[in-house]
Amino acid sequence: MTPPENKNLVQENKELIQEVLKA
């Protein structure tokens, strides 16, 4: 996995975690 893809996945994961915490 290339670093840019990894950064994007980390960003998506953070957003998903925020959604779960809000729920």
From Swiss-Prot:
Catalytic activity: N2 + 8 reduced [2Fe-2S]-[ferredoxin] + 16 ATP + 16 H2O = H2 + 8 oxidized [2Fe-2S]-[ferredoxin] + 2 NH4(+) + 16 ADP + 16 phosphate + 6 H(+)
Function summary: This molybdenum-iron protein is part of the nitrogenase complex that catalyzes the key enzymatic reactions in nitrogen fixation.
Cofactor: [8Fe-7S] cluster; [7Fe-Mo-9S-C-homocitryl] cluster
UniProt similarity note: Belongs to the NifD/NifK/NifE/NifN family.
Biased composition (Basic and acidic residues): 12-23
GO MF annotations, alphabetized: ATP binding; iron-sulfur cluster binding; metal ion binding; nitrogenase activity
Biological process terms in GO annotation: nitrogen fixation
Free-text remark on how the cofactor is bound: Binds 1 [8Fe-7S] cluster per heterodimer. Binds 1 [7Fe-Mo-9S-C-homocitryl] cluster per subunit.
Region (Disordered), start-end ranges: 1-23
Keyword check for Iron-sulfur: yes
UniProt protein name: Nitrogenase molybdenum-iron protein alpha chain
Oligomer status and interactors: Tetramer of two alpha and two beta chains. Forms complex with the iron protein (nitrogenase component 2).
Broad enzyme group: oxidoreductase
Keyword terms: ATP-binding, Iron, Iron-sulfur, Metal-binding, Molybdenum, Nitrogen fixation, Nucleotide-binding, Oxidoreductase
